[in-house]
Amino acid sequence: MNIEQFQSMLEEKGIPLSSRQLEQFEIYFETLVEWNEKMNLTAITEKEEVYLKHFFDSITAAFYYDFSKPFSICDVGAGAGFPSIPLKICFPHLKVTIVDSLQKRINFLNHLAQKLELSDVAFCHDRAETFGKKEGVREAYDIVMARAVARLSVLSELCLPLVKVGGTFIAMKGAAANEEIENGKYALEVLGGDLKEMSTFQLPFEESERNILLIEKKRKTPKKYPRKPGTPNKLPIEK
């Protein structure tokens, strides 16, 4: 996906980009590749691939959810900033918090935010299991997002405790989404979530399947969740 295709495909979806926003994506790409030489941020470094599989793929969430309001968003395990930083570039009014367990990635994100001149962004070095217990952030976000972090039964325990009641958990998934939903239904129920919508589409050019799950937070998450670091992965909430 070259820059012209990136721009025109987003415009078709009602997301026009200014020259400044296109410049921000260019700076993002250059910074990602530069830092990737000294630390492992991504296996994808070829320009057209980064624009398709990182930038465009992240923004697809906005094809199925309206980001036009100044929502507070928490991105769990964003790594090099996906999906929330591409969304923040497209929708500058969003208030973004990223939680990541690796300090090196947080250092990269702080540097990136300066280079991109982003405001209303916060980067927290923490495990999602610990972060989700903290006063002030627990059940505080309009939207919590994650892209390819863990299977749904595990991911729900990391994300739903952070979503305010009435808010939305957006899980960005690949081709195994149906199976993950089947295995993750019980976790959603326990944690106060309800799957409202699943949208399936093909990522352009490479035609790989993507699924975007919109999960509404209906009830407060029981206090015992999330459990201590590592437990959700070892012992997922499954029947």
UniProtKB/Swiss-Prot annotation:
The protein's job, in short, is: Specifically methylates the N7 position of guanine in position 535 of 16S rRNA.
Q: What is its main location?
A: cytoplasm
What gene name is given for the protein in this entry?
Answer: rsmG
Question: Where along this sequence does the record place binding of S-adenosyl-L-methionine?
Answer: G77, F82, A128, E129, R147
Membrane-crossing segments per the record: none
A Pfam entry, by short name: GidB
Family note:
Belongs to the methyltransferase superfamily. RNA methyltransferase RsmG family.
Give the EC number(s) under which this enzyme is classified: 2.1.1.-
**What name does this protein carry?**
Ribosomal RNA small subunit methyltransferase G
Q: Which HAMAP family match?
A: 16SrRNA_methyltr_G
Q: Which domain of life is it from?
A: Bacteria
Keyword Oxidoreductase belongs to the record: no
Citing just one GO molecular function, the answer is:
rRNA (guanine-N7-)-methyltransferase activity
Query: Which lineage?
Result: Bacteria, Bacillati, Bacillota, Bacilli, Bacillales
Localization, per the record, is:
Cytoplasm
Kindly indicate whether the keyword Phosphoprotein belongs to this entry.
Answer: no
A GO cellular component term found in this entry reads: cytosol
Task: Give the record's keywords alphabetically.
Answer: Cytoplasm, Methyltransferase, rRNA processing, S-adenosyl-L-methionine, Transferase
